[in-house]
Amino acid sequence: MAETPYSSAPGTATSQTDDPGAAQTPEALRTPTKRLSLGFILMLCLANVALWFSMQPVTNILVPEQVDRFDPDPSRQIFYNGLILFGGALLSVFSNPVGGALSDRTTSRFGRRVPWLIGCGALSAGALALMANANGIALLFIGYGLYQLIVNGALAALIAVVPDKASEQQRGFVSAFVGLTLPVATVLGAVVVGLLITNIQIGYYILAVTLVVVMVLFSLMLHDARLPRSAVKPFRLGEFLRGFWINPRQHPDFGWAFLSRFLVNVGWNTTVGGLLYQYLKYGVKVSNPAASVAIAQIIAVVMIVLSSIVGGYLSDRFQRRKVFVIVSAAMIAVALLVLALVTSWTAVLVAAVIVGLGFGAYLAVDLALLTEVLPSANDRAKDMGVFNIANALPGAIGPLAAGILVPVFGSFQPLFFMATGVVLLAALTILPIKSVR
């Protein structure tokens, strides 16, 4: 018999859950127990790569290059770049949890996630086309904002697939591979857009087409369970809005996990995560910043691949999450400290190795930890969307703060020292989590 994406491993029970009440629980809301096939995991990874591939080079390369062409003044470039990223990230703070909550309530015959993957994927492609034809800062600002508003609807649906489909015993393994997709997509985007394609418009169009095609292919394979209308509470705006508040006193582990991820991203996005192009151009003074971004990211991703797979495997093997997250966050802090102490291309390469080793394990194991502290199975996409604020909000305030502070300080170094301390604090906030070892 042909293997399905959710076929059980030999000897695994075929029932969806051991809970006697499972028969009354809609399939879409049951806790998964079946092992995912390798084919499905790879397709899930491809979908994540395509989504991040459409996002990362836009933020890291295309927008900075467009700003560079629109305004030659270095100080204004850093400010405008930060302003554009701030506007888009601020909208993503709103759209990701709202999109996730609406996805959780979707009762389409195609399932809860598929309509959002395909619909938002297609609309995101349109926003990319708008940015490709921007003729100034204002239109670029509008286009980037629209893009972030829409694409985060697809992201909210896609990140919910892991808790939707992966059993607790397999989440570390699946999360390790899914965690790899961000750095892989970042390097792929840097190589394609930063090295191979020098035309900005063509770069945008490649990202748009790739996103739409892969979202459709993954949706065809997803077999997304339909949520019965009877399982959805009547929509009440006040109750819907209150649902976005997850009380950290009632769910302290979720709160600590949120704070840790938030602090890691503040440290990262205030420095190289939001200003790598400008740092290499004006701090290190490389001759080709776009190519240098690609080289540094390629080195980092090689390390990320190794540490993500090893970290995810060991985390599952020993059923430990916290120690891996703490150590990996500390390694990210060490990489930022290297850049704070030494301004050179060699230091960038050394930091790329260290941060790759740290981020790989961090992305893999922290995602696995998160799926184990979600408050409710009924609201996985919404809760993941709320958690994604810890990714999106630093993406908003980090580049803007850096764009203001770098001209004040006169250099990038003070930011790197501040970021090092923030990321070390992020490692410590994992310690109070009690429900996960």
Protein language model regions, located:
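Structural signature of the two symmetry-related core transmembrane helices
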Residues: R113-A129, V323-V338
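Intracellular juxtamembrane helix-capping segments at the cytosolic ends
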Residues: V63, G153-A166, Y362-P375
